[in-house]
Amino acid sequence: PAVLIPRPETELLLEAALAFTQPRDHAVVVDVGTGSGALAVTLAALCPRAVVYAVDASHPALEVARRNAAAHQADVVFFEGDLLLPIQERQMQVDMIMANLPYI
């Protein structure tokens, strides 16, 4: 499969990300290893003032994430690359980095 099914602890990570992001105006968040985009898409949909970036090394995974973002009208900017490299290459400043990487 192009992506893995999000694990139950994904919801806990999302709750923590929301608690950090919601009180801030225009928080900049990066989802590393976005996979299906579950975290990035949900965060962008629930916090429309946030700037959400999603990074994955897998082109097929990013295609799934892009479709999910479009389906939920979530404003997410996607980068293909290894971990934080696309963010570092662009010298981007971020407020929060989140990752729910596979461990299998």
Predicted features, each with a name:
Residues 1-2, 57:
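Acidic di-acidic motifs
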Residues 2-15:
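Conserved SAM-binding loop and adjacent beta-strand
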Residues 12-104:
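Conserved SAM/SAH cofactor-binding pocket of Class I
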